Amino acid sequence: MNIRNSLILIISTILFFSIINGSLSLDPTCVGAPDGQVYLFSSWDFKGDRYVYNVSQGYLSLSDGFRGNVQSFISGADVCFVKWYPIEQYQITAGESHRNYAALTNFGQRMDAIIPGNCSNIVCSPK
């Protein structure tokens, strides 16, 4: 066996065992969203259109492409997902993600807005 084939065999073996042990993953949730940001996706499995929300934006009314169409998300911040009429809210914490959020709670199909921090910060709905 020549050196080239030996290197290929060694590298393949290392990659194989890394994947088996879970130390190497191609899952985007392993990367996560940066601190202070939330990634919203229009399709399951973190695909489709992506909206990047930053807590410095404060209250955000979702655009038409995402209002009622948050299929998956990755959060790097504590935020509150909100539906205004009738009011519903879900507390999301930093590090939380879901690859099929719309199917889990069906809330992704009703969501209107994001508010930074805790859901207890909500006083009244916008007019």
UniProtKB/Swiss-Prot annotation:
Positions of glycan attachment: N54, N118
GO cellular component: extracellular region
Annotated localization: Secreted
One biological process term in Gene Ontology: sporulation resulting in formation of a cellular spore
Major subcellular location class: secreted
Signal peptide extent: 1-25
Keywords: Glycoprotein, Secreted, Signal, Sporulation
Annotated family: Belongs to the Dictyostelium gerABC family.
Protein known as: Spore germination protein 2
